[in-house]
A protein has these predicted regions:
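Sec-dependent N-terminal signal peptides
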Residues: 1-9
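Compositional signal for N-terminal targeting/processing segments
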Residues: 9-263
Length: 263
């Protein structure tokens, strides 16, 4: 009966294989790099956060505009799903000019997951770390943007030094070393965090689909198979000259469309 009750309340955690070993590590910041617009990535973050929140405070950090922080705070403080959804009205979570996959139905489910965990008494919060204080005009390389994003992500750790930070970002921002093919990026956001405290994982490309943007439009796009399709879970295999500590294999992706205007 207890298991049934926990399942009904959303308190049973189903994290990827290897999460226990990951959370046993001393590093306080875990960054997961994704291709935006899949159902699997935000779901995995929610379940890892669920498992972590059983033992310690957790901050779920998301690549969303920092100006959305009051909206996110109101969302997870809402007493029920309908009230929570109403807090999104008028925000870029529902009205985004470019639907690049970050504000997906999968993200909405992650937000609801965090809200339910918080309502149950878990010490868990959300933190938006896409900087709005600097643009990427012709006069500034993206390296400046990455610097600001790294600082904004670091604030999740500095404001809650007792908490484990679990962050979801695009693959480029999540890498800890420079990308030779993109010299204007310099050191990506995760590379600006203290090395001793930071782990970074890249979600494996195992086929399937994502909702992402190409040169001309945004929509459902196929993903190439670049990793063993049968692999699952947290896999420690350093890549990109130390840019990632391993991969998170979640299987073939399912495209997750933008959040609709109806709950």
């Amino acid at each position: 009966m207890l298991i049934i009750a926990l399942a009904a309340s959303g308190l049973i955690c189903t994290p990827p294989q290897g999460t226990d070993q990951l959370l046993a590590r001393s590093e306080r910041v875990i960054v997961v790099g994704e291709i935006h617009g899949t159902a699997e990535a935000p779901h995995a973050i929610g379940e890892i956060a669920c498992a972590a929140s059983e033992k310690e405070p957790v901050v779920v950090a998301l690549e969303l505009e920092d100006t959305l922080q009051p909206t996110l705070d109101a969302f997870i403080a809402a007493p029920d799903a309908a009230t929570a959804f109403a807090t999104l009205a008028g925000s870029t979570l529902l009205n985004r000019a470019v639907q690049d996959g970050r504000t997906s139905e999968g993200l909405l489910k992650l937000l609801q997951r965090v809200r339910v965990l918080k309502a149950s008494g878990r010490d868990i919060t959300l933190h938006a770390f896409q900087p709005s204080s600097i643009g990427r005009g012709d006069s500034l390389d993206q390296a400046w943007y990455e610097l600001n994003m790294g600082f904004a992500l670091g604030q999740a750790r500095q404001k809650r030094p007792d908490a484990r930070v679990i962050a979801l970002a695009g693959n480029i921002h999540a890498q800890k070393t420079p990308l030779a093919r993109y010299p204007d990026i310099g050191l990506p956001a995760a590379g600006h965090l203290p090395t001793r405290e930071t782990l970074s994982f890249k979600i494996a490309q195992q086929g399937g689909y994502s909702w992402s943007c190409g040169a001309d439009e945004c929509g459902v796009s196929p993903s190439n198979v670049r990793y063993d399709v049968d692999a699952r879970g947290v896999i420690w295999s350093p890549a990109e000259d130390g840019g990632f500590d391993g991969v998170l294999a979640l299987g073939p992706w399912t495209a997750s469309p933008p959040i609709s205007g109806e709950d």
